[in-house]
A protein has these predicted regions:
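A conserved amphipathic terminal alpha-helix motif
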Residues: 97-129
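Hydrophobic ligand-binding cavity/cleft-lining segments
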Residues: 1-36
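Residue-level detector of beta-strand structural context in well-folded domains
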Residues: 4, 33-34, 43, 55, ...
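Hydrophobic-ligand-binding modules of eukaryotic lipid transfer/binding families
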Residues: 1-7, 55-56, 86-89, 122, ...
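Hydrophobic pocket/interface hotspot
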Residues: 15-19, 25, 43, 57, ...
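Hydrophobic-ligand binding "helix-grip"
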Residues: 46-91, 97-99
């Protein structure tokens, strides 16, 4: 399990809309080459190297909570994002639970998740600085 919290200098509605607009991820996420919408509940992210991860949305509570399951050839997991208005800023609280499919990868999961989460938050921040 990996968790990251941050205070984004932007209004809740704008932060929410940025994060949930998965089709536009490639425009601002430094770790992705593209995203592909499969349906209104499923999308695929492709890394810069073209490696796909499939996401299936499991819960949407507008402007409060977004959850999805994720899977690729190396892992399965669940992501929870909680969004809270703090005046004209937004607190984000993102938690990822991931299981490596290959035992060789298990020792690296925690550090990989931390790196991914830190980059995701940094990319969000760039949109509001």
């Amino acid at each position: 399990v990996s968790n990251i919290k941050a205070l984004i200098p932007g209004e809740l509605q704008k932060v929410w809309e940025l994060v949930l607009n998965t089709e536009n991820y490639a425009a601002w996420r430094s770790d992705l080459s593209k995203t592909e919408a499969i349906s209104d509940k499923q999308f695929i992210e492709y890394t810069k190297n073209g490696y796909p991860t499939t996401f299936t949305v499991t819960l949407v509570k507008p402007y409060r909570r977004w959850e999805f399951d994720m899977e690729n050839s190396n892992m399965t997991g669940h992501w929870t994002g909680i969004f809270t208005a703090k005046g004209d800023e937004t607190e984000i609280d993102f938690t990822e639970q991931v299981k490596a499919k290959k035992w060789l990868l298990k020792p690296f999961v925690k550090s990989y998740l931390r790196k991914q989460q830190t980059q995701f938050v940094a990319d969000i921040m760039k949109n509001f600085s």
